[in-house]
Structures are given as C-alpha cells and as structure tokens.
Amino acid sequence: MNNTTSKKSSNFQQALWLGIGQFCTFAMTFVSAAILSRFLDKTEYGTYKQILYIYSTLVTLFLMGLPSAFSYFIPRLERGEQKAFINSLNRILVIIGAIISILLFVFSDLIARILENPELATGLKIAAPFPLLTLPCIGVEGIYTALRETKKLAVYHVVTKIFTLSCIITPVIIFGSNYKYAIYGWGMASFLIFLTAMYMKNKPYTKTEAIKVPNMYREIFTYSTPLLGAFIGGSLISMADQFFISRYYGTSVFADYSNGCLNIPFVIMVTTSIKNVLLPLFSKANADNNIESLLQTYNNAVNKSIVLLVPFITFCFIFSKDIMVFIYGEEYATSSIFFKCFIIRELVDILPYFSVLMALGMSRTYMNIHICGAIYMWLTGWMITSSNLPPYLIVVAGSLLQFAIRGYAVISIYRKHHIPLVNKEITKKMAIVIINCLLCGYLSFIISNLIPGNKVACINLILSGIIYYILLIPSGKIIRINYIESILQVIKKK
C-alpha cells in the first residue's frame, strides 16, 4: 500500500463508512417489507417477493463473482489501467444484463407454471428490462472501497436507497394495493440509479487516460470462471429453500418465509463492510507475499465483531416473535420461526473467510464447497417436502450448511497455507459471549413477561432490550468482556 493511500483513513473508519452504506441497503429492505406487507395481502406480497427471488437468483447466477473482481484487481493496477479495467467490466455487465432480461421475458410463463403462480408471468414480464439498468451499477462499491473513498460511497448508498424506497412504496400507498405498482416504482428507481452509478464509476478517472491492460478479458475470466461453479452452487443453495417452500407450501407460506428469512441490518452492516475492506488488503498483501502481516488485523476485526454482534444476534433470536410483529404486523407473527432458524447462521458470518479465500486464490475450494452444499440442500429439501415435514426445517438445513461451509473453508486455508483463521482465543471468546448472552437474554425474557401492562410488541422490545443490557453489561465485566466499550468505539468513530 502506498503512503498516499495509507494516510487517507484507518481500516476501521473505512469499514465504518462502508457499514453505513450497507445499513442503508438493509434498512431499505426492512422498511419496504414492513410497509408493503401491511398494504398488500399475503398473495400479492408473496408474488412480489417471488419476483425479487427469481431476479436475484438469476443475477447471482450470471455474475460469476464479477463484483468481487473490482476489489481484487484495482489494488493491483495503476490508475490508467484501473480505468481500462472498469470499462472492460462495464461492457461485460451490460451483456449479462441483456441476457438476463431476455431470459426473464421469454421464460416468464414457464417459471410461473413451475412455481404454480400464474400471476408471476405478468410480473416477470414487467420486470424483465430492469437487469439492463441494474447490472451496470455493480462495481461502485468495489471501486470506492479499493480506492479507500468509502465516505463518498456511504453518501451514494444513503441517497439511492432512500430514493428506491420512495419509488417502491409511494405508488402502492397512493394508487392501491397491487404489487405491480411496486414493480413500476422499482423500474423508475433503477433508471435514475443507473445514471448516478455511471457518473460515480467514471468520476475518479475523469482526468486519467485509460491504459490498455494486456489480456484483460482473459484475466477477468481466469479470476471469475472458477467462481462460476461456486456461484452456481451458491445460487442453487439459495434457490432450494425458496423453491421448495414456494412450490409445495403456497404463496402465503412463502410470504411468511420471505419476511422471516432476512438478515439483521446492523450485523450485515458490520460483517459485509469488514469483508469488503479486508479483500483488497489481503489481495495486495498476497501479491507482496506478506499476508501473515494482516493476521493481527483479521484477529482484531473478528474479536471486536464477536463482542459487538453476538449480543444483537442473541437478542433477536430470543425475541423473534416481537420483532416480526413489530416490523410486519400481527399477521406475520408466524414468520418468527423462520427468522429464528435463519439468523443463527449469522454467528458464523462474523468470520470473514471469503476475503482470505479469494486473496489466496482458493476459488476452486470455494467452488467445491458450494457445489457439494447445493447437492445437500436439494436432497434435504426433497426429503423434507416428500415427508410433509414443516417448512422451517428447510431453513434449519440451510443454516447448518452455512456452519459446515465456514468450517471446511477455515480447515482448508489452514491445511494449505498454515493460516489459522480460528484460533483458541477466538473460539474461547465466541463460546463465552454466546453463553453469557443466552443466559442474560432468557432471563430478560422471563422478567419482561412478568411485567404487567400493555404487551405491544414495540414496548415489549424496548423494555426487554433495556433489561437485557442491564444484565449483560455488568455480567460482562465479571467474565472480562467489555460490551459497552465495543459500542462506544463505534459511536466515537462516527
């Protein structure tokens, strides 16, 4: 890393600004889901979520890991070469967007028949042109993260997410309870964000002349092709529970599932931002044969994440029903079982193994893990539906798979490169914090239920949260875990 780059800001500050952008992304998901689930009935809302599911599945499948290529290549290239690289990747993204748009339109009727929802055909045809607008937007995050200008990226995320949210929910509120209005709003937002993203991607290089990189396309596909298998596997893993629940349990249950299976915004804000900051750092260090020097940075990030995030995850697990009712309304109280089964996987998301795997060039290992995982998920989903077992067991199977994937990745990295991503210190701290949080969480659950009065979800969550941290912070001092310091660090850095 050169001196100019190193002076721009600390890694934590970069992660913090990136985290703010991530928070806006997931906050928009939360708020839009909360509003639409109240204005649309379960069938309409389920159809809307199915369209998003099909769209996101195809995008993930066809991108072949290209978004991470921005963070991987840019730190390795000179300024002029970076501009040529971005232009090359933009052309690839436009082509992929066109392919996805054609597939959505042509196969909309077939997809609707497979998922046994005739209304899907109309919705998919309306949404078919959107990939042409949304895919070229990919890369803004990778560019500004690699250039260590994440403050600008945070502003971009805040503005675009607020605008997207307004475009999606306003037509539904004004014109009526129909999912098509939300799709139309999404399309309008996509067009304006496309213009903004193109400006953002070109802005750092307006005074830079592009320098052609020899065999650039070959380099891009050499990097991304091994990831293709991994992302196909990852897409199939993601598709499995959505497909089986959508097809065999109905649109209404799918609405419950889709509302329950969502990440906690604050947790994803932290874990994703750390991953995105570490990837270019590890990539540069690996190119300089100095990756061991970053292990302390990695360990510090993981230890801080454990103390900061495990209490949030535990609280959400214990008070899942109140959270679902508060966000979506009493009608979606049944989403709590899906939410509880889903968020346990966020405990292993604290380990940013992906950054290390990619920096070490272990994309083939990543591919093999996900292909095996896809086979497991589809076999498990088939067995659960064939046995008429409850749908939440499919989500449990998916969460267990995420634990297995992280475990295998950590072992593979250690065997091949002797890099211990999970040491005794991390394991011990994780175990102690989880036990401490569970004890305080269930005790606060019991105490809050003994308090007489109004059991409105919002009030119950506030009271329970206060009791939870009143118990957690002093007990943390006994076991030498400073929970309050981890929170104050985030506030002070802001």
Question: What are the residue ranges of the model-derived segments?
Answer:
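Hydrophobic transmembrane helix module of multi-pass membrane transport proteins
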Residues: 91-232, 239, 344, 444-446
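Transmembrane helical elements of multi-pass membrane transporters/channels
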Residues: 13-29, 160, 185-197, 201, ...
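Membrane-interface junctions at transmembrane-helix termini in multi-pass inner-membrane proteins
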Residues: 133-156, 343-375, 382
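Membrane-interface helix-loop junctions in multi-pass transport and translocation proteins
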Residues: 37-44, 147-152, 162-195, 363-364, ...
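Helix-loop junctions and terminal segments of transmembrane helices
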Residues: 33-34, 63-78, 146, 260, ...
